[in-house]
Amino acid sequence: MRSFVLTLLLCFAASSLWAQAEIVKHPIQISDWLAVGPFSSGSRERGIDFLLEHGGEAKIQPCVGMQHHSFLAPGGVVRWHKTTAIDGKIPLAYKNVNWEALQEAWGWMGLANVGYAYAEYQHLGTRQVALILADKAGCFYWNGCPFPGDVYGRHYVYVPVMLKPGNNRILVRVGGWKEPKFSFKIFPVSVAIFINTFDLTAPDLVRRQPLDSWLGVPVAVTSERPLQNITITLDDKSGYLQPIRLSIKNLLPLTVQKLAIPIRTNRSWPEADFAADTLWANLKVEADGQKYTARIPLRVVNFQQPHRVTYLSDIDSSVQYFAVLPPKNFAYDQEKRYALILSAHGASVEAIGQAMAYEPKDWAFIVAATNRRPYGFDWQDWGRLDVLQVLQLAKSIYPIDSDRVYLTGHSMGGHGTWHIGLHHADQFAAIAPSAGWDSFQFYVPLFLQKGEIFGQPQMLAIRDAVLQEERASVFVENAQNLPVYILQGSEDDEVPPTHARHLFGLLKRLGYEVVYNEVPGKGHWWNVDSLPGGTSCVDHPALMEFLRKHKLNSAPRRVVFKTTDLSVNNRLYWVQIDRLQKLYQEAVVTAEINNEHEIEISLQNVAQVQFLPEALTRLIQPGKLRLIVNKQVLTTRWQRENRIVLSLHNDRYRLGTLKQGKLTKTPALYGPLRQAYFTPFVFVYGTKEDANQHLHAARILAEEWWWRGNGFVTILADTQVTSEIIQKYNLILFGGPRSNFLTQRLQDYLPIKISNEGVTLGSFPIPGSDLAVKFIYPNPLNPNKFVVVNAGTSPLASCLSERLSLFYTGVGFPDFMIFDLSFKEKGWGSMIAAGFFDQNWQVAKEYCVVR
């Protein structure tokens, strides 16, 4: 492969505004590349390396004609070939692939694939930092080190890399449908900080309204050394903003952190006659004696317009926003309460755009959460938690009637409506999914994953136990007291009407209140001009009228509650499940008030359940109470404000609680692995050995959390973790006991032990020189928080574990996983052991599979 010699001589003054604005205006773009593909890629499967035949993604140096096996291509072989950029876009230009046949055989998943492009860049200067923007690329390797791409092509994922003198190898991994294209831009920089104004999370300034909120600004450290004693100031020339001064002790080299900056208006703002639609704020960052400035545009609107409201996330203290459309002709009235319509957007849609699709109602606030990003997390996991926080914020900010809260959404947001509505049915008076899909397997099937091809059924059952909570079909029984309106276009080829028809049928057969409106001739996103309101597929008059006529029944006489994962939700109306008999299997509570002194209860896979007094006081009377539990009769005397607790002892239920050990799984301390990232967490990299490897792994995962989840995470060395950090955060550890001081400190107190010779899982020895390990466990130094260990029996295995991200939905990681380097080829087929800790956080045969 010949080197492409490109030279750029740019010199920027570090203290000038022009420098920050101009850094990303004059990129180096490579015209000539080598490309190869396509390789079959299973939906939502990470970590597969399709280039292992020639060294793998990190090491390959291809040439024209070098071949790899791929069953998507004629003859089962693909070869590296030349390709040239066209208008800045690099086509992978696959050869002779019969896409029609693949789609006919496998549906649209037959078009999903991964390809690669390779080039070399000759840097004539000394070591220098550059920013890279790899649009529509999943990731790229710079001299063998992986970095995140801007997979969705949103044009904001600028990541710092180090240019070395001479030849620099570039490998870009691109996923997509049929024949994808990408762009790759290099921006050499000579400043230490890049303020990324392409990815601001900013509130709107509302005329006549004071502002006391937050601004999120990504800052990239484009320096090889850490920056100390950073000062950030925010103000504006007009004086409408209060001057803000913020101090940060240090920023790590070559990192991107989206910082939370307070933003407040002065007293003069509510009285200001500000006619312009933008107020420009000035942001200044001072570090090591240098000043870096950027102008921040703040949109100015009237209160009646859809506008953005920012807040700090409970998960990671990052700045998020929701959009709000106030009621028509709204005026504050202490006596008046409005309905709240929570609206979930579809993939690629901004929350502010979702709010703009509606016409104002005189009876309701419309609030659109973000799912953390336009693509985000399918309204599951962090997306679900985002909605629940926005719900509480909206109820605290606006005059909301809690009995008239509704959930609706379109496409991905329709799935979110099903997912959130069925898991949290007691939060909503009614839900209205539009073009919503049921589950991943029903929508984007996983059958082409390498794990599906190579995985043992017992191992895949562990993964599927984690994933089952995303299947709406499984939880439709929870809609016993939740009216549902389903809207669907009959000709929708994005989310086919089969999803809506299927879920409608399930609800109808249960006898639940459900309306199905399949609109003839309409596709995915549609409008009917003759109908009043906003865009019809989200603001349909019949849908809105259905919502409007319903009020929440917060104390229903009959409750059906099904769950499989208490970390997602353990409470519905007046029923709370505290413990399951068998973890991650379906648990069902059916409880019905027969009369004022009798409750009939059916329990399936429930070890302990509570019935909560707030609702019961409206349903039963104090005094003697008869409980019929799985046909077993119990009696008690009940007083108002008393909880009723039932627990299982020797196959029979009795009043009272189960004994708890020193460590017991509770909904807040339950697993699986992803739960450690649902409450505040920090990354802790090892410095005993391989410090650069661990730090880089922490960097790229922090960058993924930023670009995928609009998130923030602090990265610390193992020697920097204080008792205060241990008390406040879940610790995500990079490196095993050989390379991380903190992992070494905890090793004797953890049920999984790692050495150079192998892994011990409880009492099971698993020998192996290249075993990767990931597991979650209550922190022995603070059992109210988690530790997550990412490690291995070798540097290669540790690297594999550390880089295996779970910042996406459909990941299916349980409490612990032990796997080998064949993960890069076989995915879940590489698992040596996987499973869940038992109720007492111990290794138990019934909850794990060891190969």
Task: Please identify what each model-predicted range represents.
Residues S15-S16, Q20-A101, R169-D204, D212, ...:
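Accessory carbohydrate-binding/adhesion or oligomerization-edge regions at the termini
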Residues A202-P203, G239-R337, G671:
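A domain-start/cap signature at the N-terminus of enzymes
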Residues N329-K336, Q380-M412, L422-F428:
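Gly/Ser-rich "nucleophile elbow"/oxyanion-hole loop immediately N-terminal to the catalytic nucleophile
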Residues R337-I397:
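Active-site machinery of serine-nucleophile hydrolases
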Residues A429-V476, N481-L482:
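Mobile cap/lid helix-loop segments that gate and shape the active-site cleft of serine hydrolases
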Residues E491-D493, P497, R501-H597:
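C-terminal catalytic histidine-bearing segment of alpha/beta-hydrolase fold enzymes
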Residues E600, F611-E614, L619-R851:
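Solvent-exposed alpha-helical segments and adjacent loops
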